[in-house]
Amino acid sequence: MLYQWLYSMADEFSPLNVFRYITVRTFIAFFTAFLLCWIWGPHFIKRLQLKHFGQAIRDDGPQTHKKKAGTPTMGGGLILLSTLIPCLLWVDMMNPLVWGVLIVTWGFGLIGYMDDWLKVSKKNSKGLSGKIRLAGEFLISGLVVAALVHFHGLSTAVTIPFMKSVSIDLGYFYVIFAALVVVGTANAVNLTDGLDGLAIVPVMISAATLGLFAYVTGHFSIANYLQIPHVVGAGELSIVAATIVAAGMGFLWFNAYPAQVFMGDVGSLSLGGFLGSMAVITQNELLMLVLGGVFVVEALSVITQVISFKMTGKRVFKMAPIHHHFELGGLTETKIIVRFWIISILLAVLSLATLKLR
């Protein structure tokens, strides 16, 4: 909103014309979000400590995690607040795509908050009922996607990565498909958030990549040149993505091993919802399988473990999600984390390659 006020005075003071450029506002929003998160961080963490919002640790988890008991959780609230203010200042809030992403992000964050609250208040790791959580996530994502399709003309066609001008129009079924993408991404990120800094960096990498996709899909000339779908107004989402990356960096300052704070479900679900909604709006739903490969593998490891145990009584992994399997296999926590970061970078580069390799 601030940028609109500044830009409105451009006739009297021509240098203010720079605020009409998405790139300029992206850089300003980035540093605004980082500074807010970095400055607020110590105060936010202290507040969580005073309220005794400590993390409950699973009894069946790795023994090395016992020392993490009591570490403040619900730090995802710091990320959300640090992104909201820059968005209100530097993003066009009249853009329906922006509202769609923010509603999903904050809606999923609210579900995560309720889940975290139940965990810290009851001092166990159970939290909100899985059925209630999933119902809320599908309701929010389904309504947002349906509204964007009906009122904004969001395409119901699903593009195929690495293939030029190939898409499948799902029609009315697209809303269900898109909701599955958003909910699946959110819960995959949630499962990944089990080690210090493990989830936030892949989230930042994915957000930066999707932010770039948002910029090019929102730019008619670039989208036409690359022969990718053009989504009117998607460029503004690159600013939102920049705030997520920046706030993530600010959060990592405190979340890096050994963590001073955990993001909790309020963080993992909201950030996962953000990534899923960005993938849907930029029409990169299937590409998320590549870009979010780390999240996909983590989720599949849990699904495989559950199915195997129910059908055969045996476990495929020593413990799921798979990062715990590696921990119990003797790898140190920091080595697992950094290797997952490296994999995320490689997958992001591969995803960006689809812009030309079609």
From Swiss-Prot:
Q: Where in the cell is it found?
A: Cell inner membrane
Q: E.C. number, please?
A: 2.7.8.13
Give, as in the UniProt entry, the pathway in which the protein acts: Cell wall biogenesis; peptidoglycan biosynthesis
Q: Name one GO cellular component term.
A: plasma membrane
Q: What does this protein do?
A: Catalyzes the initial step of the lipid cycle reactions in the biosynthesis of the cell wall peptidoglycan: transfers peptidoglycan precursor phospho-MurNAc-pentapeptide from UDP-MurNAc-pentapeptide onto the lipid carrier undecaprenyl phosphate, yielding undecaprenyl-pyrophosphoryl-MurNAc-pentapeptide, known as lipid I.
PANTHER family from the entry?
A: PHOSPHO-N-ACETYLMURAMOYL-PENTAPEPTIDE-TRANSFERASE, PHOSPHO-N-ACETYLMURAMOYL-PENTAPEPTIDE-TRANSFERASE HOMOLOG
Provide the protein name: Phospho-N-acetylmuramoyl-pentapeptide-transferase
Q: Which gene encodes it?
A: mraY
